[in-house]
């Protein structure tokens, strides 16, 4: 694979459904067995439903904002600059409790069809606020 720079303006956001308050943009797509890297943008008060990844650990780097992760029976608060690793099979969710958007850099150690599933969702461009935040990092 040749190196490639992605500029914020080139990113395509997606929502899984029209009810979602989260946009995800794929930065590097795995082939099912390799990792996928993506940007998550969560609106205030958004909450991702509980789920698990049976063959993938998930890694989160908080770029901006505050987040509460719920992993098994534990609540963990994190903010910009913090990193969290969720082991495979761990039931987890996350919520944005803050009044501002939450930005996460996320890695799934094994794609498990995630990127393909996301691409079947609703294309939703990143807006001017998102692009300004990404440019300021």
Locate the predicted segments by residue:
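A short hydrophobic beta-strand segment most commonly corresponding to one strand
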Residues: 39, 85, 100-117
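A generic "binding-loop/recognition-motif" signal
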Residues: 44, 55-56, 74, 90-91, ...
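Glycine- and acidic-residue-biased ligand/ion/polar-headgroup-sensing regions
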Residues: 55-57, 62-67
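Conserved short histidine dyad/triad with adjacent acidic residue
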Residues: 38-53
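A short, N-terminal "cap"/entry segment at the start of jelly-roll beta-barrel domains
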Residues: 1-35, 119-137
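Short beta-strand His + acidic residue motifs that chelate non-heme Fe in jelly-roll/DSBH
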Residues: 50, 69-70, 86, 92-98
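Short acidic-glycine-tyrosine-enriched beta hairpin
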Residues: 73-88
């Amino acid at each position: 694979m040749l190196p490639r720079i992605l500029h914020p303006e080139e990113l395509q956001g997606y929502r899984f459904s029209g009810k979602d308050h989260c946009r995800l943009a794929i930065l590097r797509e795995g082939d099912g067995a390799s990792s996928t890297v993506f940007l998550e943008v969560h609106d205030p008060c958004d909450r991702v439903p509980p789920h698990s990844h049976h063959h993938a650990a998930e890694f989160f780097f908080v770029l901006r904002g505050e987040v509460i992760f719920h992993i098994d029976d534990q609540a963990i608060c994190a903010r910009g600059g913090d990193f969290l690793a969720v082991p495979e099979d761990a039931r987890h969710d996350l919520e944005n409790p803050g009044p501002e958007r939450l930005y996460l850099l996320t890695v799934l150690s094994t794609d498990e069809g995630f990127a393909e599933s996301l691409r079947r969702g609703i294309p939703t461009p990143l807006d001017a606020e998102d692009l300004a935040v990404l440019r300021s990092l």
